[in-house]
Amino acid sequence: MSMIQSDQDESSDTSDASEVSDTLEDKVIEDEKIETRIPLSTSIVLEKLPDQKQVQLSRITNESGIFKVTIRFQPIGSTPSINPRVFKISSNQSISTISKFLIKRLKIKSNLIYLYIQNSFQPNPDEKLGDLYHLFKTNNELIINYCHSIAFG
């Protein structure tokens, strides 16, 4: 983005305050240019990496793909259990998807169920299952406990 500025007329020796303030404002605007973010896939530097570094980079980018997550559901307290207890779901799904699934499967009329990861904490509804799986898997399964009322406070 280029700024168009007019040259001052050399024949006029007087300059008023409005012209000075205009040039100062132009300078401030030019100094505050927003940097554009370029995705790594279009980076010229990444294309010129040595072969070994290219292989390492491709491994990292390929690992972030979508995969199936194994989930084991365990009820807490008097909440009924579902059969089967183990399901597979895409890693890009969120916890809210699991919540909706359990509400339908258990036929809960209040549309409210509390989910916990390994009886420890309640995840955010927008948390991705793939991220939770990588952090909290046990025996290659993500254990999700569910309950009708708040179990841990």
Curated annotation (Swiss-Prot):
Keyword Oxidoreductase among UniProt keywords: no
Keyword set, alphabetical order: Autophagy, Isopeptide bond, Membrane, Protein transport, Transport, Ubl conjugation pathway
Region of interest: Disordered: 1-26
GO biological process entries: autophagosome assembly; autophagosome maturation; autophagy of mitochondrion; cytoplasm to vacuole targeting by the Cvt pathway; glycophagy; piecemeal microautophagy of the nucleus
Glycyl lysine isopeptide (Gly-Lys) (interchain with K-147 in ATG5) crosslink, residue number(s): G153
Main subcellular location: membrane
Tree of life domain: Eukaryota
Listed GO MF terms: Atg8-family ligase activity; enzyme activator activity; protein tag activity
S-S bonds: none
Cellular location(s): Preautophagosomal structure membrane
Gene Ontology, cellular component aspect: Atg12-Atg5-Atg16 complex; autophagosome membrane; cytosol; phagophore assembly site membrane
Lipid bilayer topology: Peripheral membrane protein
Task performed by this protein: Ubiquitin-like protein involved in cytoplasm to vacuole transport (Cvt), autophagy vesicles formation, mitophagy, and nucleophagy. Conjugation with ATG5 through a ubiquitin-like conjugating system involving also ATG7 as an E1-like activating enzyme and ATG10 as an E2-like conjugating enzyme, is essential for its function. The ATG12-ATG5 conjugate functions as an E3-like enzyme which is required for lipidation of ATG8 and ATG8 association to the vesicle membranes.
Description of how the protein assembles with itself and partners: Forms a conjugate with ATG5.
Family membership: Belongs to the ATG12 family.
Record's protein name: Ubiquitin-like protein ATG12
